[in-house]
């Protein structure tokens, strides 16, 4: 059973106990009221009270005492039910704790597996990038590379924007234009890609020649293969000791980022839910 199952049972038991405690309080109030009624009857009896009236009042008192006994019987029954449910509540809380510990261990195991998988992919991408850089350097020296493989002249970028295409209209296009309007060189696919270009080569070139990589992390981003390719390339550069990745969260929660990449969730990020494009640009100016 998962923790939600036990939590629901605990909530039900706690409600049952609270209802029983209220019933006990109601019966205690009834008992107090009946004792007051008995006292009231006693105060009406004096030496002039006739035998018939006295007998009538005694029957009245007997009725109140019977009601009091009934209240006490109910209270005892409610208290017994509370004791039973409290014992059951204690067991359910222990079961909840065990379920939570089991779920936490599973989450940690899943995160560890993901980190190992990510580390393996990063190593592969790192070797791939190193090979590309070495090939580009070698072909440049031997003048054997075409203008399609390495743009001429070589261009340096302040920022490479990694994003999912679904986020272009929401945030990415406006951010890219705002950065360019503030004098930054920006690698953004709508600025750089032309018909017939090799997407992989252009991305590799942008990643290799950008000072920073802005990563727009969104629900769409974490599902894309190309964005993961770009992110792995940036992580490979960071492993050489350079701060590269600048995360911006867009319509995504910390738990979602944590499931995608625990190491990425640990980075200080800007968030479009609280930062405007102008705020983001100002923060990037301070790098």
Curated annotation (Swiss-Prot):
Molecular-function GO terms, alphabetical: hydrolase activity
Catalysed reaction equations from the record: NAD(+) = 2'cADPR + nicotinamide + H(+)
Lineage: superkingdom: Bacteria
Any one biological process term the GO annotation gives: signal transduction
Cited InterPro entries: TIR_dom, Toll_tir_struct_dom_sf
Signal peptide region: none
Site positions for Important for ADPR cyclization: 226
Xref: Gene3D superfamilies: Toll/interleukin-1 receptor homology (TIR) domain
Residues at the catalytic site: 230
Stated consequence of mutating residue 226 to Y: 60% 2-cADPR produced, very little ADPR made
Keywords: Hydrolase, NAD
E.C. number: 3.2.2.-
Domain TIR: 155-287
Summary of the function given for this chain in its UniProt record: NAD(+) hydrolase (NADase) that cleaves NAD(+) into nicotinamide and 2' cyclic ADP-D-ribose (2'cADPR).
Subunit structure and binding partners: Homodimer.
Record's comment describing the protein's domains: The TIR domain alone is active and produces cADPR (residues 134-258). It dimerizes in crystal structures.
Descriptive protein name: 2' cyclic ADP-D-ribose synthase BtTIR
Record organism: Bacteroides thetaiotaomicron
Lineage, opening ranks: Bacteria, Pseudomonadati, Bacteroidota, Bacteroidia, Bacteroidales
């Amino acid at each position: 059973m998962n923790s939600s199952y036990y939590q629901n049972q605990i909530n039900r038991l706690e409600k049952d106990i609270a209802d029983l405690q209220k019933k006990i309080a109601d019966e205690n109030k009834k008992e107090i009221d009946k004792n007051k009624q008995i006292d009231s009857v006693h105060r009406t009896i004096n030496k002039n009270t006739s035998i018939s009236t006295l007998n009538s009042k005694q029957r009245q008192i007997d009725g109140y005492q019977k009601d009091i006994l009934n209240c006490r019987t109910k209270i005892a029954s409610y208290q017994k039910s509370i004791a039973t449910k409290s014992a059951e509540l204690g067991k359910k809380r222990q079961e909840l704790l065990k379920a939570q510990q089991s779920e936490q261990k599973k989450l940690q195991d899943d995160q560890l597996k993901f980190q190992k998988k990510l580390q393996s992919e990063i190593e592969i991408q790192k070797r791939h990038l190193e090979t590309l850089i070495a090939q580009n350097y070698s072909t440049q020296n031997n003048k054997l590379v075409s203008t399609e493989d390495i743009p001429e002249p070589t261009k340096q970028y302040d920022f490479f924007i990694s994003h999912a295409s679904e986020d272009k209209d929401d945030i990415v296009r406006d951010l890219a234009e705002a950065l360019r309007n503030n004098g930054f060189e920006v690698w953004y696919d709508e600025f750089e890609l032309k018909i017939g270009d090799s997407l992989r080569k252009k991305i590799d070139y942008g990643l290799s020649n950008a000072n920073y990589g802005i990563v727009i992390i969104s629900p769409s981003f974490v599902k894309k293969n190309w964005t993961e390719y770009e992110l792995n390339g940036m992580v490979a550069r960071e492993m050489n000791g350079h701060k590269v990745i600048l995360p911006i969260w867009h319509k995504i929660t910390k738990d979602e980022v944590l499931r995608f990449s625990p190491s990425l969730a640990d980075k200080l990020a800007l968030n479009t839910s609280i930062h405007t494009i102008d705020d983001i640009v100002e923060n990037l100016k301070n790098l």
